[in-house]
From Swiss-Prot:
Annotated region described as Catalytic subdomain A, given as residue ranges: 151-262
Binding residues annotated for substrate, in chain numbering: 192, 223, 381, 386
Protein's UniProt name: Polypeptide N-acetylgalactosaminyltransferase 17
Residue spans crossing the bilayer: 7-27
Record bears the keyword Cell division: no
Length: 598
């Protein structure tokens, strides 16, 4: 606190001195501005000293030198805060401009442990400035656009749990450096009950001294998970707009104005900055192509191609309609976010909340878009802090989304996870409040969403049974798609994951493998009897010339017989050599599929 008081005293005294110089200068040397004269632009701190060499007046020269000295004193005082933490400020050094940073051989050895711990090279991060510059990957047109100065203020919310301190602080510095002062209401750091000591008093002392009055720290008393931690951040926010970000991002210049402008035009828009990648091993910033954000029927998020109308417009600066969001960053009007029920607090940890928000926003009167004119770089960690059993939480959360929002299409989520529609064995909690929310908001149905927002999503309404498929002569093995390049179905010890997801349809097709996602990506393949081979083929259904060769007669606990050849899918026991899946004349073997749909 003493050092901060000294800085404040220095500021006041020097400002008084500078004001005196300016008044004296104005009285003694009045300057008439002639027609056509241009005012000088305000220059960065580093350029101020250079101006004194061209000054026409010794008094002006003294003023400029004193201003430069004042800035240097303040900068050195503040920079001392980061040095006490072993960190670096300033715009140069390793990784400048988003280039890959490197370590010496001896440093690389020291970096291995922290790298494994955090899922990124935290040791290297400490050698990179908190203020480093990164590339501006915005489309050229974006840099020419002008925005109103009367935009709403934003509260930037970072969520962290056991992150490296340098990475958190670089996120904060980047937000401050690249968000106009009059638009940045506050920064809120939500600590989801971290264990690391450096994230307690050292973090709090640094941000309060470095950015007094700007940064709030909210601490959860127990580990809540990303979803509920974001809700806590929203509760603490006072800005008209709230931006939610992972605490391992860096912002590009000009990121905020286009986002806030779009929300000012329509408060029901949820805006996603375009995402670039920060490589977790060397912190190089890589440009990602403009994309929309979609998902699979398991509700795993993914990048998808922008819709056709965006491509047809031929303008890469235009907003991109998106069905959902990846989840590492989104910006929304604070009140509107509350009106639509925030994120689902009944979900655990994370996974699915990003899909739920996209569906809910579209069905309940809003929209969601990716903005190429706003770019944020994000570290994709190879290890995540909530890793323990994250698959279970994602599955549970996905079922909550399905039950509340997907109407008849909820079956697709159960199929994708290979779970029975009734009694799936997972307690998803009470969803009555979320269903009541949907009703009170008078939201559209999920069919409308698929038709108008996510028409690329594949649909599987023709499914009449799904799950593991077992033969009565070999009950410990299941039908499996085997290596993709072999195009041949096999038998494999049962595990119930995607390669063993069999799906029998009304048309008599027998599909094998995880559900497809969008129509632009390959679909699940069909089991085929080509009449020549003893081995059942797995082929693209649309490329099989004879419809009969891909159609099968099958009833539960009965034979699986091809309609074109009359041969049956059976198993052949070869003793020590194992069990083969073959096609041959029917011998009465029976098959059972796990989940018939009633």
């Amino acid at each position: 606190m003493a050092s901060l008081r000294r800085v404040k005293v220095l500021l006041v005294l020097n400002l008084i001195a500078v004001a005196g110089f300016v008044i004296f200068l104005a009285k003694c040397r009045p300057i008439a501005v002639r027609s056509g004269d241009a005012f000088h632009e305000i220059r960065p701190r580093a350029e101020v000293a250079n101006l004194s060499a061209h000054s026409a007046s010794p008094i002006q020269d003294a003023v400029l030198k004193r201003l430069s000295l004042l800035e240097d004193i303040v900068y050195r005082q503040l920079n001392g805060l980061s040095k006490s933490l072993g960190l670096i400020e300033g715009y140069g050094g390793r990784g400048k401009g988003g280039l890959p940073a490197t370590l010496s051989p001896s440093e690389e050895e020291k970096a291995k442990g922290p790298h494994e711990k955090y899922g990124y090279n935290s040791y290297l991060s400490e050698k990179i400035s908190l203020d480093r510059s990164i590339p501006d990957y915005r489309p050229t047109k974006c840099k020419e656009l002008k925005y109103s100065k009367e935009l709403p203020q934003i509260s930037i919310i970072f969520i962290f749990v056991n992150e490296a301190l340098s990475v958190i602080l670089r996120s904060v510095h980047s937000a401050v450096n690249h968000t106009p002062t009059h638009l940045l209401k506050e920064i809120i750091l939500v600590d989801d009950n971290s264990d690391e000591e450096e994230l307690k008093a050292p973090l709090e002392e640094y941000v309060h001294k470095r950015y007094p009055g700007l940064v709030k720290v909210v601490r959860n008393q127990k580990r809540e998970g990303l979803i509920r931690a974001r809700i806590e951040g929203w509760k603490a926010a006072t800005g008209q707009v709230t931006g939610f970000f992972d605490a391992h991002v860096e912002f590009t210049a000009g990121w905020a104005e286009p986002v806030l402008s779009r929300i000012q035009e329509n408060r029901k828009r949820v805006i996603l900055p375009s995402i670039d990648n920060i490589k977790q091993d060397n912190f190089e910033v890589q440009r990602y192509e403009n994309s929309a954000h979609g998902y699979s029927w398991e509700l795993w998020c993914m990048y998808i191609s922008p819709p056709k109308d965006w491509w047809d417009a031929g303008d890469p600066s235009l907003p991109i309609r998106t069905p959902a969001m990846i989840g590492c960053s989104f910006v929304v009007n604070r009140k509107f976010f509350g009106e639509i029920g925030l994120l689902d607090p009944g979900m655990d940890v994370y996974g699915g909340e990003n899909i739920e928000l996209g569906i809910k926003v579209w069905l309940c009167g809003g929209s969601m878009e990716v903005l190429p004119c706003s770019r944020v770089a994000h570290i994709e960690r190879k290890k995540k802090p909530y890793n323990s059993n994250i698959g279970f939480y994602t599955k549970r959360n996905a079922l909550r989304v399905a039950e509340v929002w997907m109407d008849d299409y909820k079956s697709h989520v159960y199929i994708a996870w290979n779970l029975p529609l009734e009694n799936p064995g997972i307690d998803i909690g009470d969803v009555s409040e979320r269903k009541a929310l949907r009703k009170s908001l008078k939201c559209k149905n999920f069919q409308w969403y698929l038709d108008h927002v996510y028409p690329e999503m594949r649909r599987y309404n023709n499914t009449i049974a799904y799950g593991e498929l077992r033969n009565n002569k070999a009950k410990d093995v299941c039908l499996d798609q085997g290596p993709l390049e072999n195009h041949t179905a096999i038998l494999y010890p049962c595990h119930g994951w995607g390669p063993q997801l069999a799906r029998y349809t009304k048309e008599g097709f027998l599909h094998l493998g995880a559900l497809g996602t969008t129509t632009l990506l390959p679909d699940t393949r069909c089991l085929v009897d080509n009449s020549k081979s003893r081995l059942p083929q797995l082929l693209d259904c649309d490329k099989v010339k004879s419809s009969l060769y891909k159609r099968w007669n099958f009833i539960q606990n009965g034979a699986i017989m091809n309609k074109g050849t009359g041969r049956c899918l059976e198993v052949e026991n070869r003793g020590l050599a194992g069990i083969d899946l073959i096609l041959r004349s029917c011998t009465g073997q029976r098959w059972a599929i796990k989940n018939p749909i009633k």
